């Protein structure tokens, strides 16, 4: 025969159970980290846009050169 003990729930006071609101002063480097991440993302966006524009331009020039050489060979 088993004897079962009722589970005792630990009662915590409401003051310790309640969380205090988030304050930026608690994490001073969080804002700096966020702004530096934003700068890195902006730099990457500008760099990649210039890189992709240049890449597309060089691909277009290669296609034009190929078409003109094929056109010269066929005539």
From Swiss-Prot:
The keyword Transmembrane helix applies. The chain crosses the membrane at residues 38-60. It is a single-pass membrane protein. The keyword Transmembrane applies. Induction: Lysis protein synthesis only occurs when the overlapping capsid gene is translated. Initiation at the lysis gene is prevented by a hairpin structure that sequesters the ribosomal binding site. The ribosome, terminating at the capsid reading frame, covers part of the lysis hairpin, thereby destabilizing the secondary structure and allowing the reading of the lysis gene. This is Lysis protein. Residues 1-29 are annotated as: Disordered. It is found in: Host cell inner membrane; Host cell outer membrane. InterPro entries: Phage_MS2_lysis. GO terms for cellular component: host cell plasma membrane; membrane. Induces the formation of specific membrane adhesion sites between the inner and outer membranes, apparently leading to host cell lysis. Lysis may be performed via activation of host murein hydrolases. One of its GO terms (biological process) is killing of cells of another organism. Keywords: Cytolysis, Host cell inner membrane, Host cell lysis by virus, Host cell membrane, Host cell outer membrane, Host membrane, Membrane, Transmembrane, Transmembrane helix, Viral release from host cell. Belongs to the Leviviricetes lysis protein family. Residues 1-16 have a biased composition (Polar residues). Its main location: host cell.
